[in-house]
C-alpha cells in the first residue's frame, strides 16, 4: 500500500507541475458561451479529489481521535498534505503555487474535512491568511510572503477577531500609528486559527483615530512577521471541537511594521479583509459538507449492522426516513458551495451565494451530526464511535468566518437590494 501511495504522490506532483497548471490558467478557466451547465469534473479535478480522499481515509482518519484527545497540532499530517500539493492551492503560479480556483480548493477541502475538520481548519486557516495578499498584495509582497510557503510547509494566520469584536469587525480596537516609514501596532487579537504556528499574520488595525470615521476608510491591513519583537502569543485554547487546530489570543505591544507591509494603502484594510471571504467561505462550506457526509456514512454503516426488535435499523421506516433526509440535505449543501465557488471562479461577485453556502452547509453539518448520534443511540454518545466528535466539531461551522446569523443578514441585504435596484 505504501509503495502504491508513493507512486500516486509522484504522479500527482507531476500533474501539479505540468498538466494541472496548463489546464487551469485564468484564460483556460473562462467558459465558452452557450456550453450550458455541467456537473462533470475535469480529469485533473478528479485526480486532486481522489488524492485528498485517499489521504483523508488512509492517513487522517486512523489518527484523528488521538489528535482530538491530545489536542496536539498535526504537524506530520500538515507536512504530508503540503507534500501532496493539497495546501496553499490558491497561491499564484508566479509565486511558485498552483494558482487553482476556489472550486478546486473546495473539492480538496471537503475530502480533508471528511477525515478530520481540525486538520482541514488548520489548512483552510492558511488559505484565509493568504487571501488578502492574493487579492490585494503587490508583486513584491506576494513573492516574499506567498513564495516562501511553496518552499516549505509554513503556516500563516488571519489576525482580525478581538475579544470585543467578532461579528462586528468595525468595532476592533487594535491601533496602528504611523511614525516615519513604519507603523506602531498596539492591541489584542483573539480566536486566531494557527495563531501559535504562523510564520506571518495578516493583521487588521484601526489607522484613523477618529471614532466616527467610516469603516471603509478607518482600517489598514498589514503583513506582520510572527517573530517581530512585541508580539506575545497566548496559550492554546481548549475548544469544544476541532481540538488539534491551533487557536490562540495574540497581544501586539509596540510592534513595528514597515510601510512596505501595508496592503494597498492607508484605509484600505476593511475592504481587503472582507473581500477575502468571497473566496474562502465556499471552502469553509465545503468543509462542513465533508463533515456532514462523514456523519451520513457513519450512521448508514451502523444502521446496516445494528439490529433492534429483530430487524436491522434500516428496516425501520423511522430510521430509513432519517437517512433519506440526511442524504437530501448533504446533496443540497454540496450544491450550494459548488455554486458559490463556480460564481467566483467565473469572475462574478459571489457574496450572495457564498453566504448562502456558508450558512446552509454549517447548519446541515450540525443537523446531520446530531442525527448520526441519535441513530447510534448510546454508542453515538461514546468516544469509541466517531460521531460524538463530529457533533462537537460541527458547531464551529456556524460561528467562524462569519456566524450563521451574519450570513443571513448578508443574504437578506443582497436579496432585497436586487429588488430595489
Curated annotation (Swiss-Prot):
Pfam families: Acyl-CoA_dh_1, Acyl-CoA_dh_M, Acyl-CoA_dh_N. It catalyses: a medium-chain 2,3-saturated fatty acyl-CoA + oxidized [electron-transfer flavoprotein] + H(+) = a medium-chain (2E)-enoyl-CoA + reduced [electron-transfer flavoprotein]; pentanoyl-CoA + oxidized [electron-transfer flavoprotein] + H(+) = (2E)-pentenoyl-CoA + reduced [electron-transfer flavoprotein]; hexanoyl-CoA + oxidized [electron-transfer flavoprotein] + H(+) = (2E)-hexenoyl-CoA + reduced [electron-transfer flavoprotein]; octanoyl-CoA + oxidized [electron-transfer flavoprotein] + H(+) = (2E)-octenoyl-CoA + reduced [electron-transfer flavoprotein]. InterPro entries: Acyl-CoA_dehydrogenase, Acyl-CoA_DH_CS, Acyl-CoA_Oxase/DH_mid-dom, Acyl-CoA_Oxase/DH_mid-dom_sf, AcylCo_DH-like_C, AcylCo_DH/oxidase_C, AcylCoA_DH/ox_N, AcylCoA_DH/ox_N_sf. Acetylated. Could occur at proximity of the cofactor-binding sites and reduce the catalytic activity. Could be deacetylated by SIRT3. Changing residue 401 to T: Loss of acyl-CoA dehydrogenase activity. Its cofactor is FAD. Changing residue 86 to M: Strongly reduced rate of electron transfer to ETF. Changing residue 98 to W: Strongly reduced rate of electron transfer to ETF. Changing residue 191 to F: Reduces rate of electron transfer to ETF about six-fold. Octanoyl-CoA binds at residues 167, 278, 281, 401. Residues 1-25 form a transit peptide. The modification Phosphothreonine is found at residue 351. It is found in: Mitochondrion matrix. Keywords: Acetylation, Disease variant, FAD, Fatty acid metabolism, Flavoprotein, Lipid metabolism, Mitochondrion, Oxidoreductase, Phosphoprotein, Transit peptide. The modification N6-acetyllysine is found at residues 69, 212, 217, 259, 271, 279, 301. The keyword Transmembrane does not apply. It comes from the Eukaryota. SUPFAM superfamilies: Acyl-CoA dehydrogenase C-terminal domain-like, Acyl-CoA dehydrogenase NM domain-like. FAD binds at residues 158-167, 191-193, 306-308, 316-317, 374-378, 401-405. Changing residue 281 to T: In ACADMD; mild clinical phenotype. The modification N6-succinyllysine is found at residues 69, 179, 212, 217, 259, 271. Belongs to the acyl-CoA dehydrogenase family. Homotetramer. Interacts with the heterodimeric electron transfer flavoprotein ETF. This is Medium-chain specific acyl-CoA dehydrogenase, mitochondrial. It comes from Homo sapiens (Human). The lineage of its organism: Eukaryota, Metazoa, Chordata, Craniata, Vertebrata. The gene is ACADM.
Amino acid at each position: 500500500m505504501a509503495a502504491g501511495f508513493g507512486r500516486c504522490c509522484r504522479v500527482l506532483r507531476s500533474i501539479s507541475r505540468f498538466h494541472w497548471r496548463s489546464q487551469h490558467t485564468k484564460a483556460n478557466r473562462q467558459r465558452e458561451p452557450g456550453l450550458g451547465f455541467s456537473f462533470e469534473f475535469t480529469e485533473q479535478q478528479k485526480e486532486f479529489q481522489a488524492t485528498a480522499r485517499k489521504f483523508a481515509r488512509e492517513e487522517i482518519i486512523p489518527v484523528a481521535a488521538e489528535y482530538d484527545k491530545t489536542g496536539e497540532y498535526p504537524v506530520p499530517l500538515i507536512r504530508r498534505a503540503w507534500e501532496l500539493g493539497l495546501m496553499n492551492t490558491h497561491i499564484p503560479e508566479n509565486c511558485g503555487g498552483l494558482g487553482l480556483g476556489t472550486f478546486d480548493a473546495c473539492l480538496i477541502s471537503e475530502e480533508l474535512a471528511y477525515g478530520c475538520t481540525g486538520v482541514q481548519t488548520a489548512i483552510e486557516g492558511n488559505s484565509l491568511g493568504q487571501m488578502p495578499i492574493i487579492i490585494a498584495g503587490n508583486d513584491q509582497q506576494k513573492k516574499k510572503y506567498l513564495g516562501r510557503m511553496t518552499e516549505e510547509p509554513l503556516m500563516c494566520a488571519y489576525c482580525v477577531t478581538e475579544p470585543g469584536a467578532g461579528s462586528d469587525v468595525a468595532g476592533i480596537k487594535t491601533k496602528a500609528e504611523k511614525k516615519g516609514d513604519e507603523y506602531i501596532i498596539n492591541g489584542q487579537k483573539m480566536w486566531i486559527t494557527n495563531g501559535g504556528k504562523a510564520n506571518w499574520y495578516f493583521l487588521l488595525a484601526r489607522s484613523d483615530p477618529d471614532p466616527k470615521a467610516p469603516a471603509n476608510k478607518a482600517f489598514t491591513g498589514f503583513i506582520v512577521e510572527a517573530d517581530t519583537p512585541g508580539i506575545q502569543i497566548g496559550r492554546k485554547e481548549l475548544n469544544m471541537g476541532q481540538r488539534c487546530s491551533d487557536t490562540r489570543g495574540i497581544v501586539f505591544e509596540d510592534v513595528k511594521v514597515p510601510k512596505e507591509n501595508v496592503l494597498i494603502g492607508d484605509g484600505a484594510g476593511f475592504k481587503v479583509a472582507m473581500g477575502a471571504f468571497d473566496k474562502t467561505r465556499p471552502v469553509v462550506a465545503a468543509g462542513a459538507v465533508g463533515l456532514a457526509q462523514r456523519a451520513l456514512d457513519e450512521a448508514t454503516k451502523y444502521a446496516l449492522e445494528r439490529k433492534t426488535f429483530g430487524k436491522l435499523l434500516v428496516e425501520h421506516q423511522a430510521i430509513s426516513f432519517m437517512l433519506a433526509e440526511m442524504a437530501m440535505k448533504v446533496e443540497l449543501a454540496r450544491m450550494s458551495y459548488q455554486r458559490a465557488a463556480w460564481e467566483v471562479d467565473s469572475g462574478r461577485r459571489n457574496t450572495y451565494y457564498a453566504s448562502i453556502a456558508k450558512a446552509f452547509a454549517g447548519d446541515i453539518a450540525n443537523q446531520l451530526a446530531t442525527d448520526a448520534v441519535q441513530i447510534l443511540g448510546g454508542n453515538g454518545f461514546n468516544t469509541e464511535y466517531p460521531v460524538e466528535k463530529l457533533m462537537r466539531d460541527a458547531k464551529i461551522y456556524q460561528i467562524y468566518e462569519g456566524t450563521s446569523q451574519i450570513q443571513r443578514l448578508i443574504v437578506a441585504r443582497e436579496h432585497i437590494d436586487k429588488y430595489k435596484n
